[in-house]
């Protein structure tokens, strides 16, 4: 019997990432939530069509809502359903988690920023974080630190030889 090649198997269940989140914000505390989706949205996500780059999460009436995420409908989606790719999507969270988020957002001035959208078993989950915006000098310092880390690795690699 032949061995299974683990390199060919794709274990990455990520649908979409918000790569700008860590660049534009200080990410403090991370959370995971489910999404309330319609059928055509699930089909679109299975095809890998999603964009959460310009999205954010807001709290209204004790519920969390995802705004600005784009799930473009497939051309073969049902024609009798009106597809709105930019609609508000409800996040499925426990009351305790919602109360925690409300307290931090209203009292401490945090924003809630989506980080990634992924499959967990058969469910679509969204990972998000409490975040504070970065100033321009903070962004420059992060770039400088990242470049120094790369240079340090290069120097260590060449010094070992």
Swiss-Prot record:
InterPro entries: SmpB, SsrA-bd_prot, SsrA-bd_prot_CS. GO terms for cellular component: cytosol. Keywords: Cytoplasm, RNA-binding. It is found in: Cytoplasm. GO terms for biological process: trans-translation. One of its GO terms (molecular function) is RNA binding. Belongs to the SmpB family. Required for rescue of stalled ribosomes mediated by trans-translation. Binds to transfer-messenger RNA (tmRNA), required for stable association of tmRNA with ribosomes. tmRNA and SmpB together mimic tRNA shape, replacing the anticodon stem-loop with SmpB. tmRNA is encoded by the ssrA gene; the 2 termini fold to resemble tRNA(Ala) and it encodes a 'tag peptide', a short internal open reading frame. During trans-translation Ala-aminoacylated tmRNA acts like a tRNA, entering the A-site of stalled ribosomes, displacing the stalled mRNA. This is SsrA-binding protein. It comes from Psychromonas ingrahamii (strain DSM 17664 / CCUG 51855 / 37). The gene is smpB.
């Amino acid at each position: 019997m032949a061995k299974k090649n683990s390199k060919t198997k794709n274990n990455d269940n990520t649908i979409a990432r918000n790569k700008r989140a860590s660049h534009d914000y200080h990410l403090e505390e991370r959370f995971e939530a489910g999404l309330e989706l319609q059928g055509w949205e699930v089909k679109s996500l299975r095809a890998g069509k999603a964009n959460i780059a310009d999205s954010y999460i807001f709290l209204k009436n004790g519920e969390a809502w995802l705004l600005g995420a784009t799930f473009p409908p497939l051309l073969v989606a049902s024609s009798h359903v009106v597809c709105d790719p930019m609609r508000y999507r409800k996040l499925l969270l426990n009351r305790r988690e919602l109360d925690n988020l409300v307290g931090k957002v209203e009292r401490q001035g945090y924003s809630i920023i989506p980080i990634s959208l992924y499959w967990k078993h058969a469910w679509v989950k969204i990972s998000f974080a409490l975040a504070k915006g970065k100033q321009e000098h903070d962004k420059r310092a992060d770039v400088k630190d990242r470049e120094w880390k790369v240079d340090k690795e290069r120097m260590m690699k060449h010094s070992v030889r």
